[in-house]
UniProtKB/Swiss-Prot annotation:
Function text: Necessary for normal cell division and for the maintenance of normal septation.
GO cellular component: cytosol
BP GO terms, sorted: division septum assembly
Record-given protein name: Probable GTP-binding protein EngB
UniProt cross-references to InterPro entries, sorted A to Z: G_ENGB_dom (IPR030393), GTP-bd (IPR006073), GTP-bd_ribosome_bio_YsxC (IPR019987), P-loop_NTPase (IPR027417)
Organism: Rhizobium johnstonii (strain DSM 114642 / LMG 32736 / 3841) (Rhizobium leguminosarum bv. viciae)
Chain residues that bind Mg(2+): 44, 66
Pfam families (alphabetical): MMR_HSR1
Length: 217
């Protein structure tokens, strides 16, 4: 099977680097997708569930634990010459954690915003929204930035196992309506549960299509 036809989630993923500042970014090459969201929205848990590896992305009960851009790629590529992974998933620092020192928050914020504005290989940002709380002001601020920077993004609801199943369709419709007029928003809203596995295949397929890969498995 040609390298470009390898299923995206059919083999292990690895962590390749943490990026505390833009100087540490890997060279631009394969297309990237990034995961953004409020602190404790479940980014690390969702990444682990997507790739089927519980310990890949570190999870913590401490909000604001992720302080760098963390890069994950499919394993089995040397990274040299043309032997590059087909894509990278970037776990971005959580936003909206009020108890973090202001200097630290400002540093995280600048790193994330500079990355969003300047990364040519960034294909889409998946903005994670806790299904129990919906879109908050901090989320709206990030969506405003993405619209201004013309960076494509898609809303992904997390922790749907924490709300009544009957309420999920209504929440999907309400969320879609809230972002309907936003210029950079991808119109489809996804719902997921890392705990139950709900919606993971749909998200895997969405990522594969975004980076130009026909199959995710």
């Amino acid at each position: 099977m040609p390298e470009t036809e390898k299923p995206l989630f059919g083999h292990p993923w690895i962590f390749i680097r943490g990026v505390p500042s833009l100087n540490f970014l890997p060279p631009e090459g394969p297309l990237e997708v990034a995961f953004a969201g409020r602190s404790n929205v479940g980014k690390s848990s969702l990444i682990n569930a997507l790739v089927g590896q519980k310990g890949l992305a570190r999870t913590s009960n401490t909000p604001g634990r992720t302080q760098e851009l963390n890069y994950f790629v499919p394993d089995g590529y040397s990274g040299e010459g043309g032997d590059l992974p087909p894509t990278a998933i970037v776990d971005m620092p959580g936003y909206g954690y009020a108890q973090a020192p202001k200097e630290q928050v400002d540093k995280w914020t600048k790193l994330v915003f500079d990355y969003l504005r300047g990364r040519a290989t960034l294909k889409r940002v998946y903005v994670l929204i806790d299904s129990r709380h919906g879109i908050k002001k901090n989320d709206d601020d990030v969506l405003d930035l993405l619209d201004k920077a013309a960076v494509s993004y898609q809303i992904v609801l997390t922790k749907t196992d924490k709300i009544k199943a009957a309420g999920v369709p209504k929440l999907l419709a309400e969320t879609a309506e809230k972002i309907r007029k936003r210029p950079a928003a991808y119109p489809g809203v996804l719902s997921t549960s890392s705990e139950k596995g709900d919606g993971l295949d749909e998200l895997r397929q969405a990522i594969a299509e975004t980076v130009g890969i026909a199959r995710w498995k």
